[in-house]
Amino acid sequence: MFINIFLFLFAATINISSSLRYAGFSSYIYTPNKYINNNVMDRKFIRRLNAVDESIKNNEHIIKLTDNAKNKIKQLVTEIEDKNLILKLCVENGGCKGLKYKLNPIKKEDIETDDYIQQFDELKFILSIDSTSVIYIYNNILDYSNDLINGGFKFINPNATKKCGCGKSFNV
């Protein structure tokens, strides 16, 4: 009887935690290797949350682009049929340091209602940022490199406390 109750409570806990994660709460509750017991947030993380809120209120850009990134985006816009390029940017678990960037082209109807939209009118380019990823992406710089090894879009993240050698994975 005790084992059945334990298994039921364990299964219910898993369902609740996965539904919280799906709803987007996991990024604010837990970041790998950052919080101590009982998910106590440290001061740096709370200051970063406040800075993100201020930037959003002031309509400031969450992410900045280098000239190389702007030139590549201009090239991509001229190559596609739809004259508005939309890229979805999010951070997900993975990589050797715990978190990794994901940047994919999407259609306008795929933008979610809680995404943060950053529009670059001069480039005819829209960046749709996943709401749970904003805290990790805030103040990043998007760069582009034509290098044969590790070429492509790269993120310069001043918030990262750890980075892997290839630059694809980070932790805050």
Swiss-Prot record:
The keyword Transferase does not apply. Pfam families: Fe-S_biosyn (PF01521). InterPro entries: FeS_biogenesis, FeS_cluster_insertion, FeS_cluster_insertion_CS, HesB-like_dom_sf, ISCA_plant_cyanobact. Pathway: Cofactor biosynthesis; iron-sulfur cluster biosynthesis. The keyword Glycoprotein does not apply. It comes from the Eukaryota. Residues 1-19 form the signal peptide. PROSITE patterns: HESB. Its main location: plastid. Participates in the sulfur mobilization (SUF) pathway for iron-sulfur (Fe-S) cluster biogenesis. Involved in the pre-assembly of [4Fe-4S] clusters and their transfer to target proteins. PANTHER family: IRON-SULFUR ASSEMBLY PROTEIN ISCA, CHLOROPLASTIC (PTHR47265:SF1). NCBIfam families: iron-sulfur cluster assembly accessory protein. Homodimer. This is Iron-sulfur cluster assembly protein SufA. It comes from Plasmodium berghei (strain Anka). The gene is SufA.
